[in-house]
Amino acid sequence: MLMRFSRVVSLVLLLVFTAVLTGAVKASLNDKPVGFASVPTADLPEGTVGGLGGEIVFVRTAEELEKYTTAEGKYVIVVDGTIVFEPKREIKVLSDKTIVGINDAKIVGGGLVIKDAQNVIIRNIHFEGFYMEDDPRGKKYDFDYINVENSHHIWIDHCTFVNGNDGAVDIKKYSNYITVSWCKFVDHDKVSLVGSSDKEDPEQAGQAYKVTYHHNYFKNCIQRMPRIRFGMAHVFNNFYSMGLRTGVSGNVFPIYGVASAMGAKVHVEGNYFMGYGAVMAEAGIAFLPTRIMGPVEGYLTLGEGDAKNEFYYCKEPEVRPVEEGKPALDPREYYDYTLDPVQDVPKIVVDGAGAGKLVFEELNTAQ
């Protein structure tokens, strides 16, 4: 069954004429995340604060960046302009770091590995150039723009990820308390995986993998937006715009948006899903907004009433409640949040998501 609605034409026209950004957003190193990254624990009673209170350092080369991401202690690391990794590679990020971008900050041909760490913030950075021509499916190098392993309290905010090799943001090895917010994912295949493998310990994995995705812009991506094994995920106020393209792995059409597997509990609300359009829909080719999958199926529910999702030129979303009439999880048991009206999501997210949107005024006097 295809879900089609009359406001599609007006929405497309709106997006065409809102290509110019509405302006920068004032930001601070004291900003706090919304979502699971905000949840306090015994070792982090204020939730995720990154390197707040540590030395502020400005970096302009890959070597300078790695020097401080691998240093012990708190640091606020400011990426000033474009950093090119030659050869392409990943670098490790230790605990208690804030990495923020200024002056159209870019990381080209490089990725960040947050492994065995806690309390890391990454904001306002554009990632590109990590696609390996000799490894289009990411099987040889397995490079991710951001790879989170066995880590907790991570906030990834206002970043842009363009056509990478494997994952854009992958969350694995029992990582926990993570928020991905206001990011833009463009022309990427396997966008964001939560959970390393179907073979992970189900009890341990079920206690980990608490992840929030909100106000992200998925543009012409193919799958895993996100795909969750075990754990919990709250997916709200994201914009999915699925145009035709030739994907990294040879796919022409995006496949699915949010997927739940291995008993994961996923609640999807206030999102706007835009499929390929009328011609493809009438030909029987359509985008699947939510999917239940895996050798052990996951659970997934949709918001209702003021929290409903919108679906345009999409297949019927797949759902599987834990208990009929109840959401797969109640995020407000963990944190407070405010939903934007779903009809406003396309403009809000297109205008606000991605790198280059934040201005950190306190950094102007720190140089």
Curated annotation (Swiss-Prot):
Is Signal among the key words of this record? Answer: yes
A Pfam family it matches = Pectate_lyase_4
Q: Name one GO cellular component term.
A: extracellular region
Q: Which family does it belong to?
A: Belongs to the polysaccharide lyase 1 family.
With respect to pH, the record says: Optimum pH is 9.0.
Q: Name one GO molecular function term.
A: pectate lyase activity
Q: How is the activity affected by temperature?
A: Optimum temperature is 90 degrees Celsius. Half-life in the presence of 0.6 mM CaCl(2) is 110 minutes at 95 degrees Celsius and 15 minutes at 100 degrees Celsius. Half-life in the absence of CaCl(2) is 5 minutes at 90 degrees Celsius.
Q: What are its E.C. numbers?
A: 4.2.2.22
Q: How does it assemble?
A: Homotetramer.
The PbH1 repeat units are at: 151-173, 263-289
Signal sequence segment: 1-27
Listed name of the protein: Pectate trisaccharide-lyase
Subcellular location(s): the record lists:
Secreted
- What is this protein's function per UniProt? Cleaves unsaturated trigalacturonate from pectin. Activity is highest towards polygalacturonic acid, activity on methylated pectins decreases with an increasing degree of methylation.
Keyword Calcium applies: yes
The entry's active site is R224
Q: Provide the residue positions that the database annotates as binding Ca(2+).
A: D144, D166, D170
Regulation of activity? Completely inactivated by EGTA.
* Reaction equations catalysed: eliminative cleavage of unsaturated trigalacturonate as the major product from the reducing end of polygalacturonic acid/pectate
| Required cofactor(s) | Ca(2+)
Gene3D superfamilies in the record, alphabetically? Answer: Single-stranded right-handed beta-helix, Pectin lyase-like
Q: Which organism is it from?
A: Thermotoga maritima (strain ATCC 43589 / DSM 3109 / JCM 10099 / NBRC 100826 / MSB8)
Q: Which GO terms describe its biological process?
A: cell wall organization; polysaccharide catabolic process
Record keywords: Calcium, Carbohydrate metabolism, Cell wall biogenesis/degradation, Lyase, Metal-binding, Polysaccharide degradation, Repeat, Secreted, Signal
- Which top-rank group of organisms is this from? Bacteria
